Curated annotation (Swiss-Prot):
Family: Belongs to the pyrokinin family.
Cell compartments where the protein resides: Secreted
Official protein name in the record: PBAN-type neuropeptides
Biased composition (Low complexity): 47-59
Length: 177
């Protein structure tokens, strides 16, 4: 459904949105001041000496209020200049292994592995390396027994086992057997 309205209101709304959005992106070129090595386009005075203030406040010089950023977080959130401390025992071991003329094979073993690798077993009670041997079968019919080529007809089972659905007939048949 298309709603028609006053074109003057639509143009005024469009101009208001355009000027509101472009106002936050104006750059302020500062003359002097403390930039702390930052570029002049990024000087909003939000962080000085590692202490940051909220960026939603209006700066008094420019009158620009910085908006909230809903995009992805940019930059690293952790200090990258921290030195990794090496355990002195490991450092001593590395120095011993690093001596010239000595050949070592280093194998790394993971310390905390949560999942253990499982061994595939094709049949219960048999390992994957074992082969099926004919003498393992308890009955010779296990080996030679094949599935019938056609499905059996209803009611014809070859050793006949009475079904519980037959009710009284199953009791009389079981007495005869």
């Amino acid at each position: 459904m298309i709603v028609t309205g006053n074109p003057v209101c639509a143009i005024a709304l469009l101009l208001c949105l355009v000027f509101r959005a472009s106002g936050e992106y104006e750059l302020e070129m500062s003359s002097g001041g403390s930039n702390d090595g930052r570029s002049p386009s990024n000087d909003f005075g939000s962080c000085t000496d590692g202490k940051c203030t909220k960026r939603t406040t209006t700066t008094q010089e420019s009158g620009i209020s910085s908006g909230m950023w809903f995009g992805p977080r940019l930059g690293k959130r952790h200090k990258s200049n921290e030195k990794q401390q090496i355990n002195p025992e490991i450092e001593m071991l590395v120095n011993a292994l690093d001596q010239p003329g000595m050949r070592w094979t280093v194998i790394t073993i993971p310390a905390n592995e949560k999942r253990q690798p499982t061994q595939f077993t094709p049949r219960l009670g048999r390992g994957s390396e074992e082969k099926f041997i004919y003498s393992d079968a308890t009955d010779r019919n296990e080996i030679d027994e094949d599935d019938p080529l056609f499905t059996p007809r209803l009611g014809r089972r070859v050793p006949w086992i009475p079904s519980p659905r037959l009710g009284r007939q199953s009791r009389s048949v079981s007495r005869k057997i």
